[in-house]
Every structure is written in C-alpha cells, then in structure tokens.
C-alpha cells in the first residue's frame, strides 16, 4: 500500500521554460521584441545543450535544454539570472517572464469538464472560488488548473480626442493605472506592548473607484478623472479559448498531483468527491482524461501475468521433480523473493509502475531458478542415502559457486541498464535495479530458506528408492523424459561428429538474426490502444475564433456520430492561438468495440478531409507520457530569418 502507483517512473527532464506574455503583439513582434533578447541571454549559460523557441500571437515560449550533468536547480537559477538581465530590453507592456522547471509529474492526472446553465462569468467564479479549493484540499493534489469559460475584467476604452486635448498618451494612462492599483507596506508603529504592521491599501475595489481615479489636471486646474477620458465598464474578458464537451461549451478542470503522490489514489479521491460537488453547486461533470484507469488496467494485467507465470513455473517444477515436498520447498522462493523485492523497492523510493512491474514479471522465472538448482542437488544426495540435514548442507555447498556465478551474471547484465546515460537511462533505472535486486534476494533465499526447509521437511530415502510420485501419470512423465534424454543424446552425438556444419548453421542463424533485427522498427515506448485519440487542427493564419469554432464544431459532430465514440472534448484556441483546435476523442473500451483505434484514425481522417479550409490536421495516439506532448515521429525544423522564405520552403517540404 505504501508503494506509490504510477504509469512510469519519476524522471527529471533537463528542460527549463521561459514564457512571456505580450498582449496585442503579432508573432513577428513577439519574435523580435521578446524571444530573441531572451534567446541571446540564455544561450550563454554554461551547460546549455540547445535553445529553441515558439513565438505566437501574444506569447513567447523559450525552451532551454541542459546537459544531463547539470543539476536542474542550478539550471533554473542560472536561467532566472540571465532572463533578469535581459528583462530591461523587453518592451513596455510585456509581462514579467515566468521561468519554470519542466516537471513531468506536474501534468494532470485527471481532467474533467463542468457545464451549467448559469451565467458564464459567475460559473467560472464559482468553480474558481468554491470547487477548486475543495479539490485542492485532497491529500496529494498540488493544484487545479481551469481552462475555458468567461473571466471578469474591467475594460477601459480611451477617447483619443480627449487625450490629445490634455496632452496625454495611452501609455501614460496605463502607467497611471498601474501605479494606483497597488497595495504597499507602510511600516509599523508601537501600540503599547504590541507592534502593529501598517499597510496602505490602494487596489481598486469597484469600477466606480477606477472611473474616479485622477489622471491629469485640466486647463482650469480641475482634476481630470479616468471616467472623463475613457469609457470604463465591467464585463467578460475577451474570449480567446473555447472548451466544448460533446458539442456543449464547458469549463475544464485539470487536477495536478504532488510529486511522489500515488496517481491512482489521487484521481480516485477526486472522482469520489465529484458527485458531492455536482449536487452542491448544480453543475454536470464528465471525466475526460483519467490516468488512474490506464494505470490500474496496466497494473492489473501485469499482476495477472506475474501470478500466472508463477503458477506455471511451480507446475513445471512439479512435473520435473515429481516430488510434492520438493516442489513446495522450491516454490516458497517465489513469494518470499517478490515480497523482499517490494521491500527493497520501497527502501529505494521506487513506485509500482510499468517498468518495475515489467522487471518483476521478467524475474519470475529467474527467482525460482536458484532454489530449483539447490533443491535438485539436495535431492540427488537424498537419493544416495544421506540424511536430510547432511544432504541439505553438502548439496548446497556443492553447487554454491555455480549458482552464484549464474546470479551475478544476470546482475552484470541488468545493472548497466540501470545506469545508462540520457533520458532512456532514467526510465530504465528502476527496471534494471528491480531485476538485479530480485535475483540477489532469490540467491539469498536459495542459500538459506531452501536448505533449512529441506533439512526439516525432506524425507530420508534408502539408496535407489523411487520418487514420492509413483502413479500412472508419474510413470508416463518419466517415460517421456527418458525418451527426450535418448533423443538429446543422439542429437548431441551428431552435433559433435559434424562440428563444421554445426558452426556454419549457428553462424548463419546469427547473421540472419541481425538482418531481421535491422528490419524491426524501434520505439522509445510502445504505443497501445488506450481508448483515446488526439486530433490537432490548424486553420490558415488570420482565421478568427468564430470561424475556427464553427468549422471545428461541424467536424466534432460528425466524429461524435461514429459508432464507438464515447465523447469528444475540444479546445479551440489553445494558448489563445485561435486558428488551432485540439481534441480528445474518447472511445468505448477496446473490449466492447469491434474495431481498433487505427480504424477510427482512418475514419476521422476521412471526416477531416472534407474541410477544405484546414491547413493541416493530424490524428494520433495520446502521448505515451502526457507531459511530453504529442510529438510526431519525424519533426523537421526550417530555420532562417525571412518568414516568407521559410513558409515557402516548409510548404515545399510538405508536398515532397
């Protein structure tokens, strides 16, 4: 229970992101005024591997990839120092850059949509002020991010002619509003035996206060207030992102877990709370992304494989030994080794994830090998007439060196896997160490528990006495083994008499295997049918949000009508880029539908092909690691200073 459950091990990616918002700026302005100064500043940081950026309307994203040898804390601090120096070059009106370490554990473990017939602004405030704090109180929840809906804001529309008459500029008014909208510390003063802190409250509390703010002095010496030179009104913020669930506009909430928290436990706790929140605040929630379902399904399948593999291993031992007591003694090595390995995993801070469970499942056959070899050696001495205690002692001592050599050979194979360099090494560290620890524990058990039980439970035999099992089934099994022995002896005799031919055949098989290996594809992590698809749409530059929303909505409707589609969750204008749309298509469980996810990809592509305005579209599996995004298998970057030339070259490459 104390071992965390997750999809993959916790890994640290050496990435730092610098995001800067520049309201109202075009991508070209963002590139020139924000992105380049930041890129120039951070490129000189020691340990930087490469820097790449993304400049969009209103926002600049600079990604800094460090070498794995650089401590991530030091990398973040160095980036913060350099960006702080470059901040003086950024234009007036741009917001302060936000520097953040990329953390894969900070990705949502649960995403759900919330819909209501209430006022959009009031509903978002309800979710932000009432629902989010309740969810964040759950143990293991780090934060809840809200996307979509309408946010309140105060709009100030300046009258240019009045500003001109007073000699004011929009920039001066903007700075005046910033200067007035502040809470400042005012020091402290003694009050008897106490000391009272003083704070000057200057933040606006209402729209009327904003209207009444002085901005200048008139020709007659009277105060000119903001309401005299501008229309000041409260209203919803301009919508740049639309969230829809099955065609209905909604708000999405993304639940992010704390580092090291149990993903499945956190997600299930949130799902348990949702019905109460729905009833209390009168909204409808729908689960869109649930990491717990994937984790629990994968863990269940692996545990089934582990138990089935263990049962088959014990059955095979029984068939070969034909000795109930011997099988019982040897089979005890399996659960004791697994339990010991779980304790070791807990001590090393590992979680139960696909890599550690894969290591355990692969080790099942290895865990019992040492005990079987020791038990077989003891059995031979028992059949020679030795008493159980002597047979256990001398039988174990006889094969100790061989068993140790076999075990340490396995350790020598898997320990280097745990210490591979790069991100791959971080992923497979827990895998390699889990297998290595498991076989070492099995060696310890084979040299301690197995001989002890053999000395106490094994039955002494007279020389030449038969096995315990002596029925007709045991007789047939022994006859089968005897026949195999004769076949093996004849085969071995032939091989020894035709050494050249045998060596040539082995060489041919080796060379052929190299050819087959080269023809096989390779992946960092395998794709699987997870009952979800990701759809990305891109419309031409200049496409408005209403146009993108309407066209995406028509396509969403066509996809929802496909049999086997459970839900379509769409975000139009992700990161406020209104010409983009991103969907999550939830399919019914793969065991309940006749077609694979690949068939649905083709159907969705056929639907998307009907929209002639689409610039590009892509249908793919969800990212294996949610935090890494859905990067394509091949990514080409066209670099240059002239955007028109870049667009032409990119279009030419797409045609090729």
Where are these regions (language model features)?
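Transmembrane helices with small-residue packing motifs
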Residues: 1-26, 84-94, 350, 418-427, ...
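Signature of alpha-helical transmembrane segments and their immediate interfacial
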Residues: 1-5, 399, 471-525, 602, ...
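Hydrophobic transmembrane alpha-helices and their membrane-interface caps
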Residues: 4, 311-379, 387, 419, ...
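C-terminal transmembrane helical bundles of large multi-pass transporters
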Residues: 238, 291, 328, 607-656
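Helix-loop junctions and hydrophobic alpha-helical segments within the transmembrane domains
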Residues: 288, 295, 299, 375, ...
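Transmembrane alpha-helices and their membrane-interface boundaries in multi-pass membrane transporters
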Residues: 364-378, 400-419, 426-474, 583
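Juxtamembrane segments of multi-pass membrane proteins
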Residues: 487, 506-607, 631-632, 653
């Amino acid at each position: 229970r104390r071992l965390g459950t997750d999809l993959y091990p916790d890994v640290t990616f050496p990435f730092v992101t610098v995001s800067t918002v520049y309201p109202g700026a075009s991508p070209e302005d963002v590139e020139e005024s924000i992105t380049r100064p930041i890129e120039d500043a951070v490129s000189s940081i020691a340990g930087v591997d490469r820097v790449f950026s993304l400049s969009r309307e209103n926002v600049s994203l600079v990604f800094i990839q460090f070498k794995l040898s650089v401590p991530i804390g030091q990398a973040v601090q160095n980036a913060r120092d350099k960006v702080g120096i470059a901040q003086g070059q950024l234009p007036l009106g741009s917001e302060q850059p936000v520097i953040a370490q990329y953390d894969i554990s900070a990705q949502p473990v649960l995403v759900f949509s919330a819909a209501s017939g209430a006022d959009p602004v009031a509903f978002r405030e309800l979710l932000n002020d009432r629902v989010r704090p309740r969810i964040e109180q759950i143990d293991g929840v780090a934060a809840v991010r809200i996307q979509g809906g309408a946010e309140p804001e105060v709009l100030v529309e300046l009258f240019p002619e009045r500003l001109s008459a007073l000699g004011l500029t929009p920039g001066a008014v903007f700075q005046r509003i910033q200067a007035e909208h502040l809470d400042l510390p005012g020091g402290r003063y003694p009050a008897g035996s106490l000391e009272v802190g003083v704070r000057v409250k200057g933040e606006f509390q209402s729209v009327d206060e904003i209207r009444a703010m002085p901005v200048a002095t008139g020709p007659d010496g009277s105060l000119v207030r903001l309401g005299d030179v501008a229309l000041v009104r409260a209203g919803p913020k301009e919508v740049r992102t639309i969230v829809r669930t099955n065609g209905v506009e909604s708000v999405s909430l993304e639940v992010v877990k704390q580092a090291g928290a149990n993903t499945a436990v956190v997600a299930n706790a949130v799902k348990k709370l949702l019905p109460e929140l729905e009833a209390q605040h009168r909204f409808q929630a729908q689960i869109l992304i649930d990491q717990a379902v994937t984790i629990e399904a994968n863990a269940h399948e692996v545990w089934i494989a582990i138990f089935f593999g263990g049962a088959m291993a014990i059955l095979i031992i029984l068939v070969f030994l034909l000795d109930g007591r011997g099988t019982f003694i040897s089979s005890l090595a399996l659960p004791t080794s697994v339990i010991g390995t779980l304790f070791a995993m807990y001590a090393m801070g590992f979680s139960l994830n696909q890599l550690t469970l894969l290591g355990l499942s692969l080790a099942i056959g290895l865990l019992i090998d040492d005990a079987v070899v020791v038990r077989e050696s003891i059995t031979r001495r028992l059949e020679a007439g030795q008493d159980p205690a002597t047979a256990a002692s001398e039988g174990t001592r006889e094969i100790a060196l061989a068993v140790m050599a076999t075990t340490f050979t396995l350790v020598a194979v898997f320990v280097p896997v745990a210490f591979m360099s790069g991100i791959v090494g971080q992923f497979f560290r827990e895998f390699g160490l889990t297998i290595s620890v498991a076989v070492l524990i099995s060696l310890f058990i084979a040299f301690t528990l197995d001989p002890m039980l053999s000395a106490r439970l094994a039955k002494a035999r007279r020389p030449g006495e038969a096995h315990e099992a002596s029925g007709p089934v045991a007789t047939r099994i022994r006859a089968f083994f005897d026949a195999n022995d004769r076949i093996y002896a004849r085969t071995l005799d032939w091989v020894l008499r035709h050494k050249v031919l045998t060596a040539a055949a082995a060489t041919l098989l080796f060379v052929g295997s190299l050819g087959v290996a080269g023809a096989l594809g390779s992946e960092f992590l395998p794709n699987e049918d997870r009952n979800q698809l990701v759809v990305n749409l891109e419309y031409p530059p200049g496409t408005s949000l209403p146009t993108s929303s309407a066209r995406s909505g028509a396509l969403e409707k066509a996809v929802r009508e496909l049999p086997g589609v459970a839900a379509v969750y769409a975000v139009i204008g992700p990161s406020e880029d209104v010409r983009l749309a991103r969907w999550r298509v939830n399919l019914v469980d793969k065991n309940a539908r006749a077609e694979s996810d690949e068939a649905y990809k083709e159907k969705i592509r056929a639907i998307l092909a009907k929209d002639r305005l689409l610039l590009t579209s892509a249908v793919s599996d969800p990212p294996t690691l949610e935090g890494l995004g859905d990067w394509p298998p091949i990514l080409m970057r066209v670099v240059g200073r002239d955007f028109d030339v870049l667009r032409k070259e990119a279009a030419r490459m797409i045609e090729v």
